[in-house]
Amino acid sequence: MAGINQTKCDLGFQITFNTVYRFSQFYTFSVSSFAVPGLIYFMFKRLFQLYFHGNLKTLLIAYFISILLYAVMLCFAFGYQFFVPFFIKSNCDLIINKTLFKYIHTSVIFLLTTPMMFPLGFSIERFTAMAMASRYENIRTLIGPVLVIFLIIPNCIIFYFLFQHETYDDTFISFLMLPNTTAVNFNTYLWFLLYLNIGNLALNVLLLLVHRKFKRRLLLHKTSLSTRYAIEEISQSSKFTLIITFTHLLFFGCNTICSILVRVLGEPFFGSFINHSVARGVNCAVPTYNLVIVVVGFVSLSKLNSRRQQEVQTTVQLKTTGKEGARNYDNITANQWATITQIGF
């Protein structure tokens, strides 16, 4: 038994000090370390100050908080894996404690999958906003918080059934390596999330196309200024969620496909157990997304803001001539007198 353990320790040493593996650990730790302050800055500088409706804003805040928590957990997990080898006294010190692995591993992969649930919430909220465009801005913030709860609960239930009988008896040197008894079912769940988000992305594109036709139809009719403005707000916020959804799907899809390919191709393709284990331990796509999304968020919001101002000045404008101009003048005058009367009383 001791010989088997020592063999595993020696294998762990060879994997840990493999050049590709060491670089990937350092890369993921570094990217995550930059992503954490970047996400915090983005949330306080842009996200909390968004002009979007409270329902969508709640979903976006919950989404970015889950990404932030994932980045924090990656900092700990990959920081541990990168720095611990500098202080080991024997090869067996590289083997992660069973209890520590259990809690860190499940937390990391739970936070990997949780953000993938929120794009579905974006679509539901956006369709609701379009269907109730004329009065949506006056509706209280309710559907957003409800969706956050109902999107997280299924992930919790799935994880409970995935890991309820897991004993974690394997030997692990990485928090990202799945136990063999759970790997197949978890990979199936990843495929499900990937297909779900591909379908959701198509739904978002359809939403924008329908919204564009809906917007043109409204502009042809004599709609109120507030309705036109609300339609424009829905258009801009929907474009932002589409950008977020597409970017996340791109990186998550790359991560999922590569991870499953490594398992499917197996040890023969990589030439040895060491090389195969190194490939399983590399995790760069989603951690990179955690940093990239900060840049994407700032740039896309800046561009959408400028387009929004242009649209407001061109399509959502107050006419001052003709019969419509006279009605607008009467409405403004009446509102001013009503305000003065309320102040007087």
Curated annotation (Swiss-Prot):
One GO MF term: G protein-coupled receptor activity
Disruption outcome: Reduced brood size, which is in part due to an abnormal distribution of male-derived sperm in the hermaphrodite uterus following mating, with sperm reversing course frequently and accumulating at the spermathecal-uterine valve 1 hour following mating. No visible defects in oogenesis. Double knockout with the mcu-1 ju1154 mutant suppresses the sperm navigation defect in the srb-13 single mutant.
InterPro entries with a match to the protein in the record: 7TM_GPCR_serpentine_rcpt_Srb
Compartment(s) of residence: Cell membrane; Perikaryon; Cell projection, Dendrite
Topology with respect to the bilayer: Multi-pass membrane protein
Extracellular membrane side: 1-22, 80-103, 164-189, 263-280
Tissue: Expressed in the head sensory neurons ASI, ASK and AWB. Not expressed in male somatic gonads or sperm.
Transmembrane segments: 23-43, 59-79, 104-124, 143-163, 190-210, 242-262, 281-301
Keyword DNA damage in annotation: no
Keywords from the named record: Cell membrane, Cell projection, G-protein coupled receptor, Glycoprotein, Membrane, Receptor, Transducer, Transmembrane, Transmembrane helix
Protein name stated in the entry: Serpentine receptor class beta-13
Source organism (scientific name): Caenorhabditis elegans
Top-level taxonomy: Eukaryota, Metazoa, Ecdysozoa, Nematoda, Chromadorea
